[in-house]
Amino acid sequence: MTFKFSPDAKVIVEPGSTLTLTDGTLLTSNYMGDPCNVAYTWQGVEVWGSQSNQSQNIMPLAVGKLIMNNSIIEYAICGVRAQKFYNPAVNLHRGGIIVATTGATFKNCIMDVEFLPYVNVYKDKT
Protein backbone atom coordinates (compact mmCIF):
# COMPACT_ATOMS: atom_id res chain seq x y z
CA MET A 1 0.00 0.00 0.00
CA THR A 2 1.31 3.45 -0.93
CA PHE A 3 0.47 6.71 0.83
CA LYS A 4 1.49 9.95 -0.94
CA PHE A 5 1.83 13.25 0.92
CA SER A 6 2.01 16.92 -0.11
CA PRO A 7 4.94 19.11 1.05
CA ASP A 8 3.20 20.41 4.21
CA ALA A 9 1.80 17.02 5.25
CA LYS A 10 3.08 14.83 8.06
CA VAL A 11 2.01 11.70 9.91
CA ILE A 12 1.61 12.18 13.67
CA VAL A 13 1.68 9.23 16.08
CA GLU A 14 0.23 10.58 19.34
CA PRO A 15 0.93 9.24 22.86
CA GLY A 16 -0.86 5.95 23.37
CA SER A 17 -1.03 5.28 19.60
CA THR A 18 0.88 2.82 17.44
CA LEU A 19 1.60 3.13 13.72
CA THR A 20 2.54 -0.22 12.19
CA LEU A 21 3.90 -0.30 8.63
CA THR A 22 4.29 -3.82 7.25
CA ASP A 23 5.25 -5.72 4.12
CA GLY A 24 5.99 -3.04 1.59
CA THR A 25 3.97 -0.13 2.96
CA LEU A 26 5.36 3.01 1.33
CA LEU A 27 5.08 6.55 2.70
CA THR A 28 6.24 8.95 -0.02
CA SER A 29 5.93 12.40 -1.55
CA ASN A 30 3.20 13.19 -4.02
CA TYR A 31 5.79 15.16 -6.01
CA MET A 32 8.62 12.99 -7.33
CA GLY A 33 11.64 15.05 -8.21
CA ASP A 34 14.92 16.13 -6.69
CA PRO A 35 14.97 14.62 -3.15
CA CYS A 36 17.28 17.37 -1.89
CA ASN A 37 14.81 20.06 -2.96
CA VAL A 38 12.34 20.85 -0.17
CA ALA A 39 9.64 21.53 -2.79
CA TYR A 40 9.62 17.79 -3.60
CA THR A 41 9.56 16.44 -0.05
CA TRP A 42 6.93 15.93 2.63
CA GLN A 43 7.43 16.45 6.39
CA GLY A 44 7.71 12.80 7.50
CA VAL A 45 6.50 10.95 10.59
CA GLU A 46 6.47 12.46 14.09
CA VAL A 47 6.23 10.05 17.02
CA TRP A 48 5.20 11.86 20.20
CA GLY A 49 5.88 11.07 23.81
CA SER A 50 3.80 12.38 26.68
CA GLN A 51 4.41 15.67 28.45
CA SER A 52 3.32 14.12 31.73
CA ASN A 53 5.37 10.95 31.25
CA GLN A 54 7.87 10.17 34.00
CA SER A 55 10.93 8.65 32.37
CA GLN A 56 11.76 6.54 35.44
CA ASN A 57 8.34 4.93 35.25
CA ILE A 58 7.44 4.75 31.56
CA MET A 59 4.01 3.27 31.05
CA PRO A 60 3.69 1.37 27.75
CA LEU A 61 0.60 3.34 26.75
CA ALA A 62 2.03 6.77 27.60
CA VAL A 63 4.17 7.12 24.47
CA GLY A 64 3.74 6.92 20.72
CA LYS A 65 5.13 3.85 18.96
CA LEU A 66 6.28 3.30 15.37
CA ILE A 67 6.80 -0.26 14.15
CA MET A 68 8.23 -0.74 10.65
CA ASN A 69 8.59 -4.20 9.12
CA ASN A 70 9.90 -4.35 5.54
CA SER A 71 8.52 -0.88 4.77
CA ILE A 72 9.80 2.32 3.17
CA ILE A 73 9.71 6.01 4.02
CA GLU A 74 11.04 8.18 1.21
CA TYR A 75 11.31 11.77 -0.01
CA ALA A 76 10.73 13.20 3.49
CA ILE A 77 12.45 16.13 5.13
CA CYS A 78 12.85 13.88 8.18
CA GLY A 79 11.72 10.26 7.77
CA VAL A 80 11.01 9.78 11.48
CA ARG A 81 11.30 12.46 14.13
CA ALA A 82 11.16 11.07 17.65
CA GLN A 83 9.69 14.26 19.09
CA LYS A 84 6.85 16.69 18.67
CA PHE A 85 8.23 19.38 16.36
CA TYR A 86 7.33 23.05 16.32
CA ASN A 87 9.07 24.92 13.56
CA PRO A 88 11.62 26.30 14.34
CA ALA A 89 11.66 25.16 18.00
CA VAL A 90 11.17 21.68 19.42
CA ASN A 91 9.26 20.60 22.50
CA LEU A 92 11.77 18.68 24.61
CA HIS A 93 9.04 17.41 26.94
CA ARG A 94 7.49 15.13 24.30
CA GLY A 95 10.23 12.52 23.99
CA GLY A 96 10.51 9.02 25.40
CA ILE A 97 8.99 7.26 22.40
CA ILE A 98 9.43 3.76 20.96
CA VAL A 99 10.66 3.07 17.41
CA ALA A 100 11.14 -0.57 16.37
CA THR A 101 12.22 -1.58 12.89
CA THR A 102 13.05 -4.73 10.96
CA GLY A 103 13.94 -4.28 7.31
CA ALA A 104 13.03 -0.57 7.32
CA THR A 105 14.27 1.51 4.40
CA PHE A 106 14.69 5.28 4.38
CA LYS A 107 15.22 6.40 0.80
CA ASN A 108 16.01 9.91 -0.48
CA CYS A 109 15.14 11.60 2.81
CA ILE A 110 17.03 14.74 3.78
CA MET A 111 17.36 13.20 7.28
CA ASP A 112 16.38 9.58 7.93
CA VAL A 113 15.75 9.48 11.69
CA GLU A 114 16.11 12.19 14.32
CA PHE A 115 16.20 11.49 18.05
CA LEU A 116 16.22 14.78 19.96
CA PRO A 117 17.23 15.23 23.61
CA TYR A 118 14.56 14.37 26.14
CA VAL A 119 14.21 16.66 29.15
CA ASN A 120 12.86 14.81 32.17
CA VAL A 121 10.71 17.29 34.08
CA TYR A 122 9.86 14.75 36.78
CA LYS A 123 11.91 15.16 39.94
CA ASP A 124 11.77 12.15 42.27
CA LYS A 125 11.59 13.47 45.82
CA THR A 126 12.03 10.08 47.52
Where are these regions (language model features)?
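Extracellular beta-helix/beta-solenoid repeat scaffolds
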Residues: 1-126
